């Protein structure tokens, strides 16, 4: 949800964006394609018996249904994954990136931005490929102020730090996806500072976002003048203009829990 709105907001700035969904559920680009689920890279390769030479760019990359509303362009691709319970979930990410490279998608589409929407818990090496192999120059973590979500964010920070020497990957910051938790902005701001990074923007909790998801569109189609759209525009501007990067630290669950319990208090850190 958050990533598709960022892609739309960036394209509205006149940028050419490739949005690559890196989740076996292959639903990252759904709101950019009027609720449709495109054929995934992995499914396309399976149908061609993994003969990459038989795959064209048009087979796996699709223009957003809403490009006529943008001054830029949005292109969509979904990596895909195995059937539930079968195979490695990260295989689709590996195959997608290799196929896009083979087809020179990044050059032929004349892109300004490639956005990889990666599964939050880095439980498989395949999901970390955009970070590990240097495909992602900047990493942004979407997080609420909830304890378990912050722990997942901390683990991603650990992966960024681990791969920095290999790929130069750096953290651009935290995107606060608010869940109406008490003092949530304070918790997220302090969490970012604790890990040596920054919050680049906050997305308010909103029933409008749920409504748009159910209708298969972004907020920009139904509520273009809403405060929520304003938040996404501001966030996209912060990301595009950001020049502050970090090799973050991380926390164990025990340390995080102790810190989090104090951080929720007034002026807690």
Q: Where is each model-derived feature located?
A:
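Hydrophobic alpha-helical segments and helix pairs
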Residues: 83, 92, 97-108
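Short, glycine/acidic-enriched loop or turn micro-motifs at the edges of active sites
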Residues: 24-26, 81, 120, 180
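N-terminal phosphate/diphosphate-binding loop that engages ATP/GTP or pyrophosphate donors
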Residues: 6-75
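Conserved catalytic-core segment of NTP-binding enzymes
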Residues: 12, 102-113, 118-205, 209-211
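Flexible beta-alpha connector loops of hexameric P-loop NTPases
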Residues: 81-91, 147-148
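C-terminal lobe/tail of nucleotide-utilizing enzymes
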Residues: 161-269
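Residue-level signature of catalytic and energy-coupling elements of molecular machines
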Residues: 28, 77, 96, 117, ...
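Phosphate-binding Walker
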Residues: 1-5
């Amino acid at each position: 949800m958050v990533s598709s709105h960022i892609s739309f907001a960036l394209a509205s700035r006149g940028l050419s964006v490739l949005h690559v969904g890196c989740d076996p559920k292959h639903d990252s680009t759904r709101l950019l394609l009027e609720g449709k689920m495109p054929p995934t890279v992995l499914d396309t390769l399976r149908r061609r018996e993994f003969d990459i030479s038989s795959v064209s760019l048009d087979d796996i990359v699709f223009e957003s249904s809403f490009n006529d509303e943008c001054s830029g362009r949005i292109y969509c691709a979904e990596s895909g994954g195995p059937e539930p319970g079968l195979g490695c979930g990260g295989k689709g990410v590996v195959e997608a990136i290799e196929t896009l490279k083979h087809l020179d998608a990044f050059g032929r589409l004349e892109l300004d931005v490639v956005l990889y929407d990666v599964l939050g818990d880095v439980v498989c090496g395949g999901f970390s490929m955009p970070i590990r192999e240097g495909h992602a120059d900047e990493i942004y973590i979407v997080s609420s102020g909830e304890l378990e979500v912050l722990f997942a964010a901390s683990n991603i920070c650990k992966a960024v730090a681990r791969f920095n020497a290999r790929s130069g990957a750096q953290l651009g910051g935290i995107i606060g996806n608010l869940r109406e938790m008490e003092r949530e902005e304070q918790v997220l701001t302090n969490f970012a500072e604790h890990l040596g990074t920054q919050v680049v923007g906050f997305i308010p909790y909103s029933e409008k976002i749920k409504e748009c998801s159910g209708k298969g569109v972004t907020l920009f189609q139904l509520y273009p003048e809403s405060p929520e759209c304003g938040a996404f525009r501001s966030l996209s501007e912060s990301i595009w203009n950001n020049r502050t990067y970090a090799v973050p630290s991380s926390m164990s669950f025990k340390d995080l829990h102790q810190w989090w319990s104090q951080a929720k208090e007034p002026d807690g850190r």
